[in-house]
């Protein structure tokens, strides 16, 4: 196998970067560069957007796939996000939407008939194929092809391909890992075969004799005989192969590998990978580009690769097979998921649109017992709810095919938008003498890291009442009376009012919090179950397809010979991943909203004291205190106030106990939420609470620096000597401003909350009945928008209106000068 990681990545991508630097000399004269730069949008994760294109169309949630009809008369998009799912019919020539039909469930698969009179679409966990007739430029439902009974029966169709001459529709699935053959005339399943792995894309060879199936879970492309369905060959690829593209001559298939920054070219005669293209912006970059869609120009000389997590298209010259070279990059919207070329235009679907935003109407776990307080934020007093999972509507961009100069300008913009560089990977931002080193392996006076993960709160929900920070008191559900310890940590150590989680919900949140990355499987699947459309919660190590390529923080610690131990996180009574086996506390209760966090804290104290006694405290300690998730209004379970207060007291007692231990002077505690989905925030739906405590942490300090989940992880990595896990933590700003050179080892004193921790929900009301429908045994195995509303009303009153979420499409960039204030 010929690997072009060094040639195509190092020579190609670096050559592009150097060309962009040369162009910088004339940038002031470049009207396109100046115009696009002036519209730059900075996302909550620190990355930026300057999407190319003269026109765009608004779509629904998370467009996953885009297909063109045989003549190019139509384009179809399937929108498969958390809220509204639909099929959109588009005229790619006039660049207008012809029709948009809502679907109960849909997922990825689309196929036009040869005569363009019929469109087939995968019906998600309804386990059927939706059939539409196209007449007068409209989609008209024309029945279904049923594969089996709906969820909880596990089938879930994904990629489709059609052999019109044989009246056969081939369907890959991702829940029962199979390939189905359907008769399009009788609308019946006529054959099926087990694949053994979750499928993604399904394509027929040009002569219709063979099928190519990308085994999303199996790190391979399977070739099957189209008549017998017998396996002809399995061709090994990198992790998470997704989209595929066949050349017209039938000699090669390109496959994007979403969990590996790469696209592989398969020689179908040799049945092996003969070239690997690295799609990332720098040589040997860690995981984080997420290539997930492919397109060729009509003459097949240029290949476009949609890099979902780099927010760009990578462009390769592929005229000479085995001698491909990088030409540059094109900036897109947020999380591009599909790309096609038509009529000298590049069509791109942007899964999360063009920006993030605030959600003052966000979910509220604690709807008040008294009339809603009307504060300064007028949006907080309107009726609609803004749930983060459905806030980011997709878009489609139409980008005229760029010439060489325009592509150079686009490439420079992509590099400008991307905070990750190879230099940052090895030399982080910081200051000389600070306890946070700037290089991996440099010494730090801090020896022990304690990392606490909690559940789902925004900044305004908890600290909106703190006058020193940028808060909105009208959105504060859990003020100091309920969360005295978190308020004390913010006041005594560092108040962080510009901290953003990288995730939308717990499914991707636990991946971002444990690996600074959520791969394409996670990002494209959590929306289904969170939208109440079936699916399972398996995003905390349960399925290897959801694992980042290089594993989680414990895997990286193991490679770096850093000792570690986890308490209830990725270890619910047993190890969820191999790296945690033998490194978890069996007496620490896993996720269970019926078990108090203060009891978990006692179990940690007992285990910790024994480790201290034996001089065996690991350097990295991860803990889960998750009761601030709350149980909503379910009768017999703690009220939202009591659950959050329990969580707060556990945190306070933890810091107090550690601060009175012999290792406090060498310790630091980092605390964050896995996501911020369960509440409103007037700045952005991703803004959340975060805390840092320890001897080397500043006292009485307000830090307005923009930080992220990945930045907190980067800070821990620099202390412990662990290399970045992804491009995101490599790029993120470390939290060095929170630290001081001279330690202050004054211990912390926990505060008792101003409410009864044993207070239970007692009202058999409408919200109780709604809560009974929820599965609270796992994080967010529920409709979180509704759950957030229940929490809001339980706290603020059953008739109060929960503010909508603000999602940060975020801030239009000014060159930022970070502020830090001493109190």
PLM regions: where:
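Predominantly soluble domains enriched in secretory-pathway, periplasmic, or organellar proteins
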Residues: 8, 20-434
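Bacterial N-terminal signal peptides
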Residues: 8-15
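A general, composition-driven signal for non-globular sequence regions
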Residues: 15-16, 111, 618, 708
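Positively charged n-region of N-terminal signal peptides that target proteins for export
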Residues: 1-5
